[in-house]
């Protein structure tokens, strides 16, 4: 059995905010997954998508649709990462000629570049509207979580028949995500070059986050799993945090 570990996603850590305050609370949405007509309560993704939407991480494509089986774009993923970690510092992204200041995602891309989770497709292109591949998604999340790539360098990927398709630049991040039990692939394949769907990305977050804290106050009850704080003025009794194995993707 892999060693259980604590991962505190206090919107906090990872070079975005101090541990005392979360700035992302203002962006939290009150929409529920069940508000969208294409959300399927019986689908494999139901719990993961519900958690992502209900806690303000995943937004709809329109007022009535979520498009859970649609491809996630690079800009959409940047926005979710920023909402999760409450980032506020922006980078100069003027070098990326395909990121217009008039687009909704301009600030999200600037935040993601400053955080170090995003690089361009080239020195002058970010391709924000392009779908993001599964190996790119694993890379972004691994960077955001600051996983120790060296400690996962010997992660065994032999169970996946398509492991040779993983790009060399992505391999350390894929090993880390698999080694941390956050990714388990599509059966016997990782499909690293396939586009990741919105539901699949929601599932990754569901595998990572065990507890959402959405109300101010002191939490002195047992807390299971990793923590994502979605408000400010929260006090945690850390001795009461317990770790459980994540749901498999």
Describe the residue ranges of each PLM region.
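Feature responds to low-complexity, polar/acidic, surface-exposed segments characteristic
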Residues: 2-46, 54, 59-107, 114-138, ...
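Residues on the solvent-exposed faces and adjacent turns
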Residues: 225, 229-231, 238
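Glycine- and small/acidic-residue-enriched microsegments that form turns, hinges, and capping elements
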Residues: 231-232, 248
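Residue-level detector of conserved catalytic or cofactor/ligand-binding positions
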Residues: 239-242, 246-249
């Amino acid at each position: 059995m892999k060693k259980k570990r604590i991962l505190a996603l206090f919107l906090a850590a990872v070079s975005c905010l101090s541990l005392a305050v979360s700035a992302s609370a203002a962006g939290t949405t009150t929409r529920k997954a069940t508000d969208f007509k294409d959300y399927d309560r019986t689908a494999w993704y139901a719990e993961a998508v519900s958690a992502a939407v209900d806690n303000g991480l995943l937004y709809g494509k329109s007022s009535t649709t979520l498009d859970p089986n649609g491809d996630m774009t690079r800009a959409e993923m940047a926005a979710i990462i920023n909402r999760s970690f409450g980032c506020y510092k922006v980078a100069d992204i003027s070098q990326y000629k395909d990121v217009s200041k008039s687009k909704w995602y301009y600030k999200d891309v600037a935040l993601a570049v400053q955080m170090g989770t995003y690089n361009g497709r080239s020195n002058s292109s970010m391709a924000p509207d392009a779908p993001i591949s599964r190996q790119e998604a694993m890379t972004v999340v691994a960077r955001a979580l600051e996983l120790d790539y060296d400690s996962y360098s010997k992660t065994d990927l032999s169970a996946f028949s398509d492991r040779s398709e993983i790009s060399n630049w992505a391999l350390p991040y894929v090993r880390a995500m698999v080694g941390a039990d956050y990714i388990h692939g599509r059966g016997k394949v990782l499909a690293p070059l396939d586009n990741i769907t919105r539901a699949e990305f929601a599932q990754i977050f569901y595998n990572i986050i065990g507890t959402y804290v959405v109300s101010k106050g002191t939490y002195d009850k047992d807390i299971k799993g990793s923590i994502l704080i979605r408000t400010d003025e929260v006090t945690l009794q850390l001795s009461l945090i317990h770790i459980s194995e994540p749901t498999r993707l």
